[in-house]
Amino acid sequence: MFQGASSLNLDGKGRLSVPTRHRDALVAMAQGQVTLTKHPHGCLMLFPRTEWLQFRERIAQLPMSAQWWKRIFLGNAMDVDMDATGRVLVSPELREAVGLTKEVVLLGMGNHFELWDKATYEAHEAKAMQEEMPAAFQDFAF
């Protein structure tokens, strides 16, 4: 399970250096093989390949009414291997699609990660913090 936020920088070639605490888990789970695709909220999702295969099957089974979402998730998916130093290449197409600049935030989301442009993430988080908490959280004790 992946959790926590990491502020990182993409290098000049668009590579993300995966934090050590996650790197070891990605190697153990999927031999460093990951899949990146678009998320509808304006970020990228980064899956260990084993988790991606399960997600892909669920998406592929959606009805024709969800065809455009299938295209968004599956049509933009890119398989990448983490290199020997723990870096993942984020393609120019995916970087451009979600507006990734040099400064990014990697969020652990359980079985996958979200990769956000730092300024975009901070703006979305600030807006969410100003809004009322969703009903799904009303039974939680904090």
UniProtKB/Swiss-Prot annotation:
Q: GO terms for CC?
A: cytoplasm; nucleoid
Residues in domain SpoVT-AbrB?
5-51, 77-120
Please provide the record's keywords in A-Z order.
Cytoplasm, DNA-binding, Repeat, Transcription, Transcription regulation
Q: Which domain of life is it from?
A: Bacteria
- Residue pairs linked by disulfide bridges in the UniProt entry: none
**Primary site of residence:** cytoplasm
Task: Enumerate the GO terms in the molecular function aspect.
Answer: DNA-binding transcription factor activity; transcription cis-regulatory region binding
Q: Where in the cell is it found?
A: Cytoplasm, Nucleoid
Keyword Transcription applies:
yes
Which GO BP terms apply?
A: negative regulation of DNA-templated transcription initiation
Q: Record keywords: Hydrolase included?
A: no
InterPro entries associated with the record: MraZ, MraZ_C, MraZ_dom, MraZ_N, MraZ_sf, SpoVT-AbrB_dom, SpoVT-AbrB_sf
The residue stretches assigned to a coiled coil in this entry are: none
* Matches recorded under PANTHER family: TRANSCRIPTIONAL REGULATOR MRAZ
Q: Which family is annotated?
A: Belongs to the MraZ family.
What quaternary arrangement does the UniProt entry report?
Forms oligomers.
Q: What is this protein called?
A: Transcriptional regulator MraZ
